[in-house]
Amino acid sequence: MNAVDTQYLEKHTPMMRQYLTLKAETPDMLLFYRMGDFYELFYDDAKRASELLGISLTARGKSGGDPIPMAGIPYHAVEGYLAKLVQLRVSVAICEQIGDPATTKGPVERKIVRIVTPGTLTDEALLQERQDNLLAAVYHGKVGFGYATLDVSSGRFVVTELASKEALEAELQRTNPAELLYSEDFSEPALIASLSGKRRRPEWEFDYDTSYKLLLEQFGTKDLYGFGLGEVRLSLQAAGCLIQYVKDTQRTALPHINAITRFNQCDSIVLDAATRKNLELTRNLQGGSDNTLASVLDNTATPMGSRMLQRWIHEPLRNHNIIRARHDAIDELLDNGYHESLHEQLKALGDIERITARLAIRSARPRDFARLRQALALLPEIQQQLADCNSPHLKALSSHLGDFPEEHALLSRAIVDNPPMLIRDGGVIKEGYHNELDEWRKLSQGATDYLAELEAREKAATGASTLKVGYNRVHGYYIEVSRRESDLVPMSYQRRQTLKNTERYIVAELKEHEEKVLSSQGKALALEKQLWEELFDLLMPRLHELQAFARAAAELDVITNFAERAEQLDYHRPELTAQSGIHIEAGRHPVVERVSQTPFIANPVSLNPARRMLIVTGPNMGGKSTYMRQVALITLMAHIGSFVPAQKAAIGPVDRIFTRIGAADDLASGRSTFMVEMTETANILHNATPESLVLMDEIGRGTSTYDGLSLAWSAAEHLAQNLKSMTLFATHYFELTQLPDQMENVANVHLDAIEHDDTIAFMHAVQEGAASKSYGLQVAALAGVPAKVVQAAKHKLHHLESRDREEELPELRQAQLSMTMPETSKALDRLDTIDPDSLTPRQALDLLYELKQLR
């Protein structure tokens, strides 16, 4: 705990001294300080909460001579305010009264009982149902980065080692953490500058020995080799920080975090940050979820299935055996039609994954247990259907679903059919589960029946027709009579309260009854809470099996969903081959075909060792980018185990998918559009291999014509001749269509259009050969460019086309020639003979003048 200056505390009242001491425990979080029926915030917390939540900012007297800013929220509405703060990536410490005001002199004892941070949420009301909520930590070593993620709401704990800044950037985009922990001396702040929910942690929390010890304690093992974590030092340092942080915030045991896995990038097709963004896998270019691959593929029955599907989309596999097992399972579900009934059964399971996590940390609510009971009741039906399947994958999933007859029987006996949301007010434990509880409830209910008898008797005795017996928390039980009949009440009635139109009284008999009722109700509620806690103890021994059940059910949901999507959207099974290349017949863009107002034109693609690169030409709006993206998306879909939008697809080994499509200024990093484009191009040229799929769209547009053409030509030449990557290269530089004449593994394809007078119709059909023209003026007219401007452009175009190209573009031809000829220079030859480390400043200056004369 951070120390609080003693002299400073002495200036304040006892209550504010208590508040400031508690606030020092969590100085970087808002402190919700419980006072009666409100959570109060003071000082800067009050100002900040007022601004963030739109609540009134007031003052509470003075302490230390100054007015104390104050804001408050009702305790019963706290979840709504917490949800808003979590969305804003703001953390909150919740302080409750734990002492008894009746027996306490001075401030009631309080302590922080709960800490809510964006990355450690488990409460259903605070979580996005169909999105993972990850806490992450990153540690920068001398060579590379260690990265760890933990989903506290499921127990999923993953680490990975990353060799470069680019790899870390891609991993941050893939995992999209809600909260990121990093060390105080993290040396690459620019990498995480745009992330919200960052939290700096002291360097000692990343200490290797401390981290290793924490992990051993958490998993109850002697070493971590059984998890495959023998040589991942940096990521273990990040993982240790996560465990420490979660223990600090949750303040309870975490038995559901019982394993840790390593994410090996070599097991998956590598997607860099630009590719994940450009392909709009789970988020579109505007940051939303509409019109993404996930929005089309996700018709899952359960939230946990939806979250797993999104993880699969970001982790396309390279292991063909695992993928084929998924394809076989889909085939069988389609053949026997089980996917429809399984979908309905799975829909009733709910979110067992997160319910199990709340069970583990003892924060589950009554309705969680009711949903768990329902899920366990459905298991035999699901397993009965899967018993008839031959797919090894479906059989394995069925066995992992488990068997829980005793747990189902327990919950059926213990929990009422429709429990309330909270245990706080009782009414959760079913009648017949516990004899003593039933007795206290009967006593309480019998006392309630007595009130009706008392009311009838007193009405008859007094003759007051308005007489009734009531109850409130302030005055307890009372007899109420209208003021016009108050003269009818006997002397034995003691006036308790006068209202506008009524008088309220108590009698000795009613007071005795009140004590009896409150005693029986209190004892019943206390016993019910005790029995509720015992249910956690009875279910906890099956925690690991329940987690396995949740994982298997989620995967079964995804596979069933793939079968349903294949049937509804006319997807077909792709063939995964050992031969290099991608061959697709009648391929379609999975998203565009769903939102297009006109029938989608299917197109083929053929890439193989003799045809490594396609130069794609055609008009703007002709469909070049859509065509390229659909090839990448079909390839990715095949590798997550889905069927694909194509009549036929045969896809060989793929290690990476790169995209260089579109660009915008990166203002945060001070990079222009062209700089962003060149950075992405450089990444591709450094890392692409013969098994990489590369999409290059219009590179070189952000600079002069000659510079742009030179860069585009050289990049295409390098990809085709040296890297031999499978490449789709879209361009408006028609000079690039000459590449197939110089390189055997390059071919031209184009998307055509038809002109009629001044209009243009885009055919969207891919054809062999180069496009004849770009149709730029027609597209400008369609875009609404004023007719006068378009007409003037036509005149200028005719003028330029009529000029002698031999006179007009000599530099361009020279630029093209230089791309294919080695550059020689006396200055370069002289530079090759120089050792720069041995030069004195004077020698370096003399050499500079010498080189200037040689250029």
UniProtKB/Swiss-Prot annotation:
Choose any GO biological process term that the UniProt entry carries and state it: mismatch repair
Q: Which residues bind ATP?
A: 618-625
Q: A single GO CC term, please?
A: cytosol
> Which InterPro entries does this UniProt record tie to the protein?
DNA_mismatch_repair_MutS (IPR005748), DNA_mismatch_repair_MutS-lik_N (IPR007695), DNA_mismatch_repair_MutS/MSH (IPR017261), DNA_mismatch_repair_MutS_C (IPR000432), DNA_mismatch_repair_MutS_clamp (IPR007861), DNA_mismatch_repair_MutS_core (IPR007696), DNA_mismatch_repair_MutS_N (IPR016151), DNA_mismatch_repair_MutS_sf (IPR036187)
Family matches, as SMART domains: MUTSac (SM00534), MUTSd (SM00533)
The uppermost taxa in this organism's lineage are: Bacteria, Pseudomonadati, Pseudomonadota, Gammaproteobacteria, Alteromonadales
Q: What is this protein called?
A: DNA mismatch repair protein MutS
Q: Keyword set for this entry?
A: ATP-binding, DNA damage, DNA repair, DNA-binding, Nucleotide-binding
Molecular function per GO? ATP binding; ATP-dependent DNA damage sensor activity; damaged DNA binding; mismatched DNA binding
Q: Which family does it belong to?
A: Belongs to the DNA mismatch repair MutS family.
The signal peptide, as residue positions, is none
Function summary: This protein is involved in the repair of mismatches in DNA. It is possible that it carries out the mismatch recognition step. This protein has a weak ATPase activity.
